[in-house]
């Protein structure tokens, strides 16, 4: 059964990151993965093309996908756009509608600051 992946490059470096992710998917498909992908607009790119940072059509495609790869959204180009139409609203809309509430990022604690950090070895 094929997996459906929605690729949302977004803005700035997100476009380059998404292009490389697609190369990985293509290579994995060559090695036996069964995945299809579709690229759509989100964030500032969607705002520029559609006047909305996340269109209902893209949201529906996201709901129908097995996975979503999102590059990055935002940039100074859209600083003066109404808050509800800013690129970040597209990301927030995806999180809300898909009930995604975690944003995991790698963290590094410098030894000299470990005692002041909220990151602990055990809880």
Regions found by a protein language model. Give the residues of each.
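Anion-binding alpha/beta catalytic cores of soluble intermediary-metabolism enzymes, centered on
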Residues: 1-12, 35-38, 44-123
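Glycine-rich phosphate/diphosphate-binding loop of Rossmann-like nucleotide-binding domains
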Residues: 6-30
């Amino acid at each position: 059964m094929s997996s459906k992946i929605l690729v949302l490059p977004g803005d700035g470096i997100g476009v380059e990151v998404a292009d490389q992710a697609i190369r990985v998917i293509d290579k994995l498909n060559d090695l036996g993965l069964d995945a299809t992908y579709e690229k759509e607009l989100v964030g500032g790119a969607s705002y520029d093309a559609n006047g909305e940072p996340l269109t209902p059509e893209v949201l529906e495609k996201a709901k129908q996908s097995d996975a979503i790869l999102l590059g990055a959204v935002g940039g100074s180009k859209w600083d003066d756009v109404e808050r509800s139409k800013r690129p970040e609203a597209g990301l927030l809309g995806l999180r809300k509608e898909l009930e995604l509430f975690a944003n995991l990022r790698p963290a590094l604690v410098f030894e000299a600051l470990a005692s002041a950090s909220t990151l602990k070895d055990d809880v």
